[in-house]
């Protein structure tokens, strides 16, 4: 593949060179080839983007709800028309198979934008009667300029999850994609402009997270930060946001989620769910159910079914129709995942399969790790306690409900959880005791536009998707109207 042209920043409706003079490279993780050199935004570029966003936001917010809705719907149409083009670029940048990016990444992002475009006319205030001569009414007004900071695992989907409610509510957004996967966010900016979004309402600033991201969190002209990433980075973002100007924050952070297989579960269904909860996107999904709790008496049979299904994983050419497993997103991340795997071996977990980098057959130059399953795991092991963000499943056995609930909740995380059982009374009883913000019964992983998603504990603050997220991008103004005679005590 030929190297792409140097990528610039997208500010005020068009591409512009970074003033910092700094660049970084984005890599195809399947082959190790450089895809493009990307310009990195500096502090002056953030200032330019904020000024542009402030101008554009005034124009955008002054439009009627239906005008804004039509523009966002045009962007939805453009996304769907260009699905294949965007999916191919996402595959090159992330290492996900085309079978995945073409069916999920752009499609689900467009769904969220369509959902919020439809909600714009329904964004309304309320009227509260006080007495015959007086009433209060409320208005939901935009925050102004907000910033989104994305993660590298779902680049365009995350950009849409953050920008859709923000723009629908009348805000402007400055989006910083991960430096690991920056390419499709720039294409999204082009699409928004083509759809008719006023200049400056959606700006994209590629850059190094510790620098560009910090400039955004510290900028007094930004009213809110929506961040997706790790817990440690999220705490820094939150601290900077509070110290600078008491910004509002939404945080979608890490997870170490439990998947509980009940003793009455269909083990074939349970194994299918566990595979999707661990190996989809090569395990690089924040909600993955990496702690798989299985009744002790059924563990051996469950292990057998998992190994059967691991045999159906097909790594290879990312553009081949039958490939369903790709490399990890980068070489540093691959090395980190391999270190976790070695810790599992060292701490006494029994390795059922994988446990190493994939070699040969075109894998040598990429960031490939074999699908890995550990069993006989215990709660204190590093692979059970810490988020790995790779294709590593840990199987743990349990004896009764009280035990498995206690152990499932014994984590600083609280992003997701799941239960597999045909007994819905039991399913609800278990789910209601689990400390997690996103839960599934007899399923895993679907996050439709209508469903609020977010975590408990260290897994985040606030929600993405759903009606409540649209409201979180507004501020409420209360107005009392007095129609009678005003009484003064002076």
From Swiss-Prot:
- Location of site Seems to be a necessary countercharge to the potassium cations? 248
Please tell me where K(+) 1 binds in this chain.
Answer: 26-27, 93, 180
Please name the GO terms of the biological process aspect recorded for this protein, alphabetically. glycine betaine biosynthetic process from choline
Q: GO molecular-function annotation terms?
A: betaine-aldehyde dehydrogenase (NAD+) activity; metal ion binding
**Where does this protein act, in terms of pathway?**
Amine and polyamine biosynthesis; betaine biosynthesis via choline pathway; betaine from betaine aldehyde: step 1/1
Catalyses which reaction(s): betaine aldehyde + NAD(+) + H2O = glycine betaine + NADH + 2 H(+)
Has the keyword Electron transport been applied to this entry? Answer: no
Annotated catalytic residues: 162, 252, 286, 464
Comment on bound cofactor: Binds 2 potassium ions per subunit.
Q: Which cofactor does it need?
A: K(+)
Q: Which PROSITE patterns match?
A: ALDEHYDE_DEHYDR_CYS (PS00070), ALDEHYDE_DEHYDR_GLU (PS00687)
- Enzyme Commission number, as recorded: 1.2.1.8
Q: Which InterPro entries match?
A: Ald_DH/histidinol_DH, Ald_DH_C, Ald_DH_CS_CYS, Ald_DH_CS_GLU, Ald_DH_N, Aldehyde_DH_dom, BADH
Q: Does the keyword Transmembrane apply?
A: no
Name the species this protein comes from.
Answer: Klebsiella pneumoniae (strain 342)
In its UniProt entry, what is this protein called? Betaine aldehyde dehydrogenase
Which top class of enzyme applies to this chain?
Answer: oxidoreductase
Top-level lineage group: Bacteria
In the record, which positions carry Cysteine sulfenic acid (-SOH)? 286
Q: Which UniProt keywords apply?
A: Metal-binding, NAD, NADP, Oxidation, Oxidoreductase, Potassium
